[in-house]
Amino acid sequence: DGTLKWRFYTVPNPEGKPDGAASDEIFAKAAAKTWSDGEWKESGGGGTVWDSIVYDEDLDQLYFGVGNGNPWNHGLRSGGEGDNLFLSSIVAVNPDTGKYLWHYQETPAETWDYTATQHIIQAELEIDGVKRKVLYHAPKNGFFFVIDRIDGTLISAEPFVDGINWATGYDLNTGRPIENPDARFYKTGKPFIAIPGALGAHNWHPMSYNPETGLVYIPAQQIPQGYDVPVSEIDKKRERLGFNVGIGWSIGQLPDDKDAYRAAIAATTGKLVAFNPKTGKVEWSRDYPAAWNGGTMTTAGNLVFQGTSTGLFKAYSADKGKELLSMEMQSGIVSAPSTYMIDGEQYVAFLTSKGGAFPLVAGVAGGVTRQLPNIPRLVVMKLGGKAKLPALPEKGEVIWEPPVQEGTPEQIAAGKALFGRNCIVCHGDSAIGNGFTPDLRVSGVLGDKDAWASVVTGGALKHAGMVSFGKQLSETQVENIRHYVVNRSRWTKENLPEMTAPTPR
């Protein structure tokens, strides 16, 4: 009847009081003392449970993954002190009462947006001749965890991607990561380019497990990101419409160096990883030229299916990774396939369409995916299917004639900081669009101060999803952002003509 049975908070009450919830006991006993004074008392601290929640019928336990901290910056969030339970943790509770049973925190004192919300798979794994009930987990931080699901003991934590630099591994005696001290940018006061970045070595795109092969198939990716302490007042100030994560966004924007831009494209890649939890090694993998590929599905017929952000739908042999199918789907694929039977005939279905955080913020790192059209479509396949995709609409013409640069170097620099703080998460790094939201470099209002302001602060396009920043940005700030976007339009056209705006269809 919709009556609330129990509630479990993943972060403490900012006033230090009980919540009248199932989590009160464990916070009073252990979790609350892992938090120190900081901005979490204003922001809430984070800890959202937004993806994997699974039930173990045999043990009568409910497991859920907990998200990152808010703000990201642990130095601001909690004064740089404490593990901040239950951020970035797997938590087990009694499903009837919500009573805490156990937890394992994958990233203590989380500060890089390393959520632990990714998919939790229940399995049995033979270890030293004994079958153990375990959880498989491949979160953002790049390590594959095997956890005893009876009591939360860490069994193993091994990398499923290359290049991880925030930690070198895990100490199995303590269950804690062996961190690179440079990764805690708020302690060193120096920028840190982290691998993986905030978008993770594995994000929300589903992974799958095949009991026959014993392998887990992970849609992995390599997306480095720069982290720095917020230096400017713009980055420090919490804003109603701002991305309030407590890092300096300017570090993430590339310098005026075309080689750096092309290096960013080359460094941002995807990979299908077949991971063996028993050995802690990658059994096989297949490289992709871009990140943000679709989830995986594996079947009893020794198959693995996956769509890619470059618009291909692929099938591989599950044991060896031999490519068996590669079909052009006209649009990017971020969803996972599903399969079902009707009258004894098997079907495979999936959705096409670009979407999610990466195409919004990626900028140049979107690489080859930028020019793919965004076509939302349900595709259903079967053996012997005869249907064909309709022809693509004809490409439109992009008119890329940047306005005259009227802004001074000081105005452009100010606009860059403001763009990073207010605009980058929807309109892309360096104002390079990815075909998902408008590419501001070719905006029809870019050359007109008043028209630009009518959109940014006047709400002229609020019906299309562009909110007004009228209560947040001054007239001077809006104009400085325009000067910066004009600068990006002119510079990229001259130095990176291949980074033209996505072609309309």
Model-derived features: positions:
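Extracytoplasmic/lumenal domain signature
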Residues: 1-39, 76-115, 123-131, 143-193, ...
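Long, low-complexity segments enriched in small/aliphatic residues
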Residues: 54, 188-193, 199-225, 258
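Residue-level marker for isolated small/hydroxyl-bearing positions within beta-strands
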Residues: 65, 138, 219-221, 307, ...
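His/Cys-centered metal/cofactor-coordination and adjacent catalytic loops
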Residues: 389-411, 424-443
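Flexible coil segments in periplasmic/lumen-exposed cytochrome c-class electron-transfer proteins
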Residues: 394-410, 417-421, 464-505
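Gly/Gly-Pro-rich "capping" loops immediately C-terminal to redox-active cysteine motifs
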Residues: 416, 428-469
